[in-house]
Amino acid sequence: MADFFAMPLWTDFLWPLIVMVAQSVLLLVVLLIAIAYILLADRKIWAAVQIRRGPNVVGPWGLFQSFADLLKFVLKEPIIPSGANKGVFLLAPLVSCVLALAAWAVIPVNLNWVIADINVGILYIFAISSLSIYGIIMGGWASNSKYPFLAALRSAAQMVSYEVSIGFVIITVLLCAGSLNLSAIVEAQHTSGLATLIGLPWLTFLNWYWLPLLPMFVVFYVSALAETNRPPFDLVEAESELVAGFMVEYGSTPYLLFMLGEYVAITTMCAMGAILFMGGWLPPVDLPPFNWVPGVIWFSLKLFFMFFLIAMAKAIVPRYRYDQLMRLGWKVFLPLSLAMVVIVAAVLQFAGIAPK
């Protein structure tokens, strides 16, 4: 038996595989529990803005409401429309959910706390978020109904439009950090920046990219709303126009998978905002007692702050018209983000502070 554990098959393949599977299962469990409470927080924030209490019956202060909703969805019978393509109809929500979860494989929640610390992590997330459109298009087409199909077409145009702006945001961060590795981007915000230049390196929050790249932070925030079909850009699911959008024919577990994929994608965008612009797991001030707090706590607080901004947009901003949405993406954000790429590159080059 000891000889087996010394074999290259065990040390080089089986053991790393077991560790990776265990890490993935742990991340999945933690992420799904976090999504349950993020969904509850979304409803509570919306209720507070409208001077309501929100969910408050299931468990103390409504803390178990999301788990009751899960049970309700699972116990319902899934109904497939008679004219629908059954295989594609059932595959669509699975594709949407799995792709959203796969993005978390490269997101570091603390120093060395990441499943796959690849050097192109930010491009991997960008690619995965682009692929998630296929789940929506498949669901809209397979439903064999005009409302889901129209919503799927809207979604395709909307996500393509705002991915361009997010791409330019990524380029500006790449220029400042000198790496596409998400952990390296966080570390770059620890060792260089405005606080370092003025001789106060312990003021870590001044090193974060939200300050020098503030216009791009705003572009990223608004583009994240559009990319994840959140209000005021929820034209894909506009209740007053398309009933429930591409999900109108779905119920039971398939509908739950679509909703889960949507909220995981929102959480991914919040995590990206925390990593790219707010220093990831870094404390705002690198002095006691702030640096005594575990990095994963700081990361979680920043993620929830980003989600709070997204939830408030749902509560206070009216929905855009479709032409306004397209005009904002192509005529405002695209020129602005392109100009910022040129400005950031020029400043870094001529000031002599470009990363080596």
From Swiss-Prot:
The chain crosses the membrane at residues 18-38, 87-107, 120-140, 166-186, 202-222, 257-277, 292-312, 333-353. It is an enzyme of class 7 (translocase). GO terms for biological process: aerobic respiration. It is a multi-pass membrane protein. NDH-1 shuttles electrons from NADH, via FMN and iron-sulfur (Fe-S) centers, to quinones in the respiratory chain. The immediate electron acceptor for the enzyme in this species is believed to be ubiquinone. Couples the redox reaction to proton translocation (for every two electrons transferred, four hydrogen ions are translocated across the cytoplasmic membrane), and thus conserves the redox energy in a proton gradient. This subunit may bind ubiquinone. Belongs to the complex I subunit 1 family. This is NADH-quinone oxidoreductase subunit H. It comes from Nitrobacter winogradskyi (strain ATCC 25391 / DSM 10237 / CIP 104748 / NCIMB 11846 / Nb-255).
